[in-house]
Amino acid sequence: MYYLEHELKQTDPSKIAYIAFSNAAADEAKKRITNDNVIVSTMHAFGSRELQLNTSTHLLKGDKWKGFKNFSNICADLSFESYINESGYPQYKNSHMKIIEYAKNKRIPLDEAALQLELHYSTDIYLTEQIQADLITYKEQTGMFEYSDMISKFVEEDKCPPIHTVFLDEAQDLSPLQWEMFFYIESKSQRSYVAGDDDQTIYTFQGADPDIFINLKGITDPQIKSRRVPRTIHKLAESIFPHMSQRLEKQWEPRDAEGKIYNDIPYQDIDFSTGNWMVLTRTNKMLTALKDHMYDLNLRFEAKQQELLPKRMVNAYRVWTRLNQGAFVNKEDLKDLWDYLTVKDGHLVRGYASNKTLESITSIDMEGLRAEYGLRAAGSWEILNFPESSKMYI
């Protein structure tokens, strides 16, 4: 934040854009940036806002895919089930859509995308090409759009607002499509600041290209001392680097703590009842047994999928938590939250109970909801109108 504070001393805050790769990074930045006039956003949210896209009516997601399946006979029996990951991109189970999304993000032909994803043997690429062609036609005729269009159309339609300085965070995980958007914004700006670490790239499976970050030109300011990694973990990480085919050579020192590594300990033997824990697994499937274990212990936890609770309840909990942290949220997220707020319980002013009152919202924080949308609820998530039988699983 040092460079941002420096810019705020000499630049109109409304002409500063802070672009974060993930929703989590954007939320964290909103908590740390005290000047409300600075534009803090993910690329998708920024593009959607400037393009004035209606994500509730024209974004292809969920049931909205039914229209396309009726339009394209070859897609009638295909599933378009997906979830939106932290970077704002849909993750499809359908191999054709995996290839199409990857190709758009990487800016490469479909057959090359299928090869890189190792789907060239199991997927009919000619069918993939026809699905893509039908999808383009359908969007042209209906005005529907996909998540990637929030970025590509932002550039194509020259929608960048007046910006003097742009900041980019977590740059190592940007795809070529996202880099196009950043370079376009940068071309409209006087100064740019880019933060990232190619060693931390994790989204290559959806098209991230750390080589673009590695090859950037400009003045560098290496952050040598780690604030997180103790010596033991640092030593393990250093042993991995020689096996990486391409990386930016850098000096990197551990923080002043020893740290510990425990190998081959069954998760059943770990005491999760004290402290805060983050559990990472290589695949989502591996989390299933861990989640069941947490349920058995009556421990509260947050995960992308909690089958014992309705998705809208989990989303309402997350949205309320984010709002209390100072984050901005969109109207789609708020609609789930509003289902658990009532006038009777003092959560809302009379006349604001219907989530239809939220239609004009693009992005808003807790203060805005209190000032303009009748919100009166305050406190932890327990005040939400959740069934008592469900609260123990949150």
Put a short name on every predicted segment.
Residues 56-76, 214, 240-248, 316-347:
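A polyampholytic, Gly/Pro-enriched intrinsically disordered region
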Residues 320-394:
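Conserved helicase C-terminal RecA-like lobe
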Residues 1-58, 235-238:
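P-loop NTPase Walker
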Residues 259-275:
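Conserved interdomain hinge at the start of the Helicase C-terminal
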Residues 57-85, 188-201, 217-226:
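Conserved phosphoryl-transfer catalytic core
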Residues 79-167, 176-181, 204:
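Accessory N-terminal region flanking or inserted into the helicase ATPase core
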